[in-house]
A protein has these predicted regions:
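P-loop NTPase motor module signature
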Residues: 1-434, 502-510, 546, 550, ...
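Short, solvent-exposed loop/turn motifs
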Residues: 190, 544, 736-738
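Acidic, serine/threonine- and proline-rich low-complexity intrinsically disordered segments
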Residues: 443-544, 557-729, 767, 771-832
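Phosphate-centric recognition/catalysis
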Residues: 749-754, 760
Length: 832
């Protein structure tokens, strides 16, 4: 094993040799250290070695987290080479599908998810002395989670554990303050990089063409290899086609995460003497990875970002603008070995619209996998962890709801036995539940195939079919024929999952509905029921989706949707399988509701999933209180029109309202329509349920005497006062009881009566204990108004004689006395 000074001497050209001793001293004195160094300074390769040299083997190993598998592999290989060893000796790495670690390994380079698994299995991290978080500026959700769990371990269980945060562009002030950690800076020896901006901004659709054009231009004007950054694999493939054979003999290499390790090694390997190459890369090449000979960077200015929609519960990839710190990382790749140039495919003026730093993924991501890991770690309160960026409470609530639905956590957010099994699988809880719940050997194998297909890029991207079973069949055919081709990575992942759940490979033909059953287990909220026209479905979550009309799946009544694109109006289904209704995990409920169409209460026993009803049967002997509540709610919703809303009811409301306004001190009950409706559940049940029978139809409800029901809301003594102050009728000289019209309380009550019935009436009637004079609306024999007055004495003495002339002319057969006060009042016709 090399000593500290030997390591420094062998790496004298690396700028971080100047700070290596300071880092070790800071680690001795502090629990956390923050370090910044520019790209190429040796922070990812030299410093872990010098830290190792400063600790005894008995102190424990060093874990270094890299955000990507490609970087983890290359960094480990480079450190091993610096020690004149092979990986698996003093330096090893663990990434998905690869493990180069032995008992003698002291530095283990791992990806973030692996550290989380280690902490869940051993919260003490026994045998580990230092945890290094490299390229921490990327702030992936896995990195933030791994840090929070490690920090909790350090604070509560392992105060001797050391944590190092490393980056080239991180916001050091906030992190140093949060961790109470010293900052060590390495200025590095970067060569100058000339930045050239485009004259116009490009759109995502123009990226492959614009990058190819810039590469052609740069290739002819500058020496050295070219590294171009594009958002995704499809952009790289299109750009590669545009460059095909045009720059020969310069070789063109793609570089992205889904390539095999051998393909990735070819892309980053140094060019031969006198040779040039072009590397078309996703952001995987932004950090840690060293591509020797690069002197030109072409930056599209875009990346692919997973965007989570909490309303739909779905995530989708979007092509978005990069942040300025990402642009700095990318341009730095051109100045590692010599002066370089960076072509930025955006205008200088547009940079003010770019974010200063990338937004932490935890602020926008689906938190369900994170919360399941936290529960498996033994923490039920996710917000209590020492986060650098605390997750949004709404996103936490959404994730907890999903985990509860999947049965992974209980109501106290504690992990269940099912959740414990799910947490052991390195995939989303949706997928892990599907594999854990698979029981038979055939189901287990099928679940592993489905998981692998969903986890990887769809090999049939040019195929419009959304049939998941088509993919499964093609995968199994490729395995049978030992001709995997484009299915090789999916087959590799499926095999890994089979090993994890102890399943055996199966290449038999499948039943489509069996696949649908497994998908529905994984995504219960994506069970889809056909609606409206062919190809349109509604998910159990309430989201509407559609599938191409030409698809063989479009005519099914039920589907289990495995992949889709979220949309506000109508999402698009990318992968699905048919589903039998009897295979759906449903909840049984008794639903009692008011059926407006049929005018009555409907009572059903239903099997449901989310907002969807799978099937229903009539419900007999329903709970009476529930039926009564349903009727009350219907009345509140549809109005008192469901009841016998007569003129008598309206007049009663007016009478009571008038007295209430005249005498607020009485505190009369409120009989306004709004209040009566809002309190229907308090007074209406007595009339709905009578003699053991509940009224359930609109016709039956019409039989309720609403006038008496509302009148009964007023205590008896108050009823008497209302009758005294605002009588419903007034008896006139003819003996008739005439109804009083109580209009607005500010207006006088009106008594509409035929003039002939008032002969002999000396004084105008009053209400409100004699305080308010009634407005007399005197009518002709034909019930037409002839006079309005509140002074009958004055009327008889004056206006009556003019009215009499007109009435004698119009009604000559009727009796119109000259002295009405002495005349007999009559109800009918009295001849002259």
């Amino acid at each position: 094993m090399m000593e500290f000074n030997d390591i420094i001497r062998n790496a004298a050209s690396l700028p971080t040799t100047e700070i290596a001793a300071d880092v070790n001293k800071a680690l001795t004195a502090n629990g956390c250290v923050v370090l910044t160094a520019p790209p190429g300074a040796g922070k990812s390769t030299l410093l872990p070695l010098t830290v190792m040299a400063g600790f005894l083997p008995s102190d424990g190993k060093i874990l270094m987290l890299e955000p990507r598998r490609l970087a983890a592999r290359q960094v480990a290989e480079r450190m091993a080479d610096m020690l004149s060893e092979h990986t698996g000796g003093s330096v090893g790495y663990r990434v998905r599908f690869e493990n180069r670690v032995s008992e003698s390994t002291r530095i283990e380079v791992i990806t973030e998810g692996i550290l989380t698994r280690m902490l869940i299995a051993d919260p003490l991290l026994e045998g580990v002395s230092v945890v290094i978080f490299d390229e921490f500026h990327e702030r992936s959700i896995n990195s933030d989670l791994a840090f929070a769990l490690t920090r909790q371990c350090q604070q509560i269980l392992r105060p001797d554990l050391k944590i190092v945060i490393m980056s080239a562009t991180i916001d050091t002030s906030s992190i140093c303050t949060s961790l109470n950690a010293p900052l060590i800076e390495c200025r590095g020896k970067m060569f100058p990089v000339e930045t050239r901006y485009a004259t116009t901004d490009i759109s995502p659709a123009d990226i492959p063409t614009a990058v190819a054009s810039a590469i052609n231009k740069a290739h002819s004007q500058h020496e050295g290899d070219i590294l171009a950054f594009l958002p995704g694999q499809a952009d790289i493939a299109q750009c590669e086609r545009l460059l095909a054979d045009k720059l020969s003999p310069t070789a063109v290499f793609p570089l992205y995460g889904n390539l095999s390790p051998e393909q990735q090694r070819r892309a980053v390997a140094p060019s031969g003497k006198g040779e040039r190459k072009i590397v078309l890369a996703t952001p995987v090449a932004e950090t840690s990875i060293t591509i020797e000979g690069v002197r030109i960077v072409v930056d599209s200015g875009y990346c692919r970002q997973l965007v989570y929609n909490p309303r739909s519960g779905l995530s989708h990839l979007e092509t978005v603008r990069i942040s300025l710190d990402m642009a700095t990382q990318r341009s730095g790749r051109a100045g590692r070995v010599a002066p370089g140039v960076c072509y930025r495919l955006w205008t200088k003026a547009s940079e003010h619209r770019m974010n200063e730093r990338r937004r932490p993924e935890i602020s926008d991501a689906d938190l369900a996998p994170t919360l399941l890991d936290i529960a498996a770690f033994g923490e039920s309160d996710a917000e209590a962890l020492p986060w650098l960026t605390t997750p949004q409470p709404s996103a936490v609530a959404q994730a907890r709801k999903l985990l509860t639905t999947l049965g992974a956590v209980d109501s106290q957010n504690r992990i269940t036995s099912l959740g414990r099994q799910m947490s052991k699988l390195p995939c989303h809880p949706h997928i892990s539940k599907m594999m854990v719940r698979a029981k038979s050997p055939a189901q287990k194998s099928l679940a592993c195939d489905i998981a692998a297909i969903l986890e990887e890029k769809d090999p049939l991207t040019d195929d419009t079919s959304a049939d998941l079973c088509l993919r499964i069949s093609l995968l199994r055919t490729a395995r049978r024929q030992h001709r995997l081709g484009r299915w090789s990575r999916i087959a590799q992942i499926a095999e890994e999952y089979r090993n994890m759940i102890k399943a055996t490979e199966c290449n038999d033909d499948i039943c489509s509905e069996d696949a649908g059953c497994l998908v529905a287990t994984a995504y219960p909220e994506r069970v889809a029921k056909a609606i409206d026209s062919i190809g349109h479905f509604r998910l159990a979550s309430g989201v509407n989706v559609q599938i191409d009309n030409g698809s063989n799946l479009a005519s099914y009544d039920w589907l289990a949707v495995a992949a889709l694109n979220a949309s506000e109006k109508c999402g698009r289904v990318f992968l699905a399988a048919p589903l039998r209704p009897e295979d759906i995990e449903t909840r049984q409920r008794e639903r009692i509701f008011w059926d407006s169409k049929n005018g009555g209460v409907a009572m059903l026993r239903e099997r449901t999933i989310g907002v969807l009803t799978v099937d229903s049967q009539p419900l007999h002997n329903a709970d009476k209180s529930a039926v009564v509540s349903t009727v009350c709610e219907a009345v509140q919703k549809e109005g008192l029109g469901l009841l016998d809303w007569s003129d008598d009811v309206a007049r009663l409301q007016k009478r009571v309202d008038a007295v209430a306004e005249w005498h607020p001190e009485m505190a009369l009950p409120d009989l306004s329509t709004e209040h009566v409706l809002s309190t229907a559940s308090e007074w209406l049940p007595f009339y709905i349920e009578q003699n053991g029978k509940v009224l359930t139809t609109a016709a039956e409800l019409k039989k309720i005497n609403l006038h008496d029901a509302l009148w009964a809301l007023i205590p008896y003594d108050m009823q008497q006062e209302v009758d005294r102050l605002a009588p419903s009728h007034i008896t006139v000289p003819s003996g008739s009881r005439i109804r009083v019209d109580y209009r607005k309380a500010a207006e006088a009550p009106v008594l509409s009566v035929r003039l002939q019935e008032c002969f002999g009436m000396l004084h105008t009637p009053c209400v409100d204990g004699g305080k308010r004079t009634v407005l007399m609306e005197l009518l002709s024999p034909g019930f037409k108004p002839v006079q309005l007055t509140q002074d009958m004495d004055s009327f008889w003495s004056n206006a009556y004689f003019e009215v009499r002339k007109e009435l004698k002319r119009r009604y000559p057969k009727h009796y119109w006395p000259e002295n009405p006060l002495d005349a007999e009042a009559v109800r009918g016709v009295k001849r002259k």
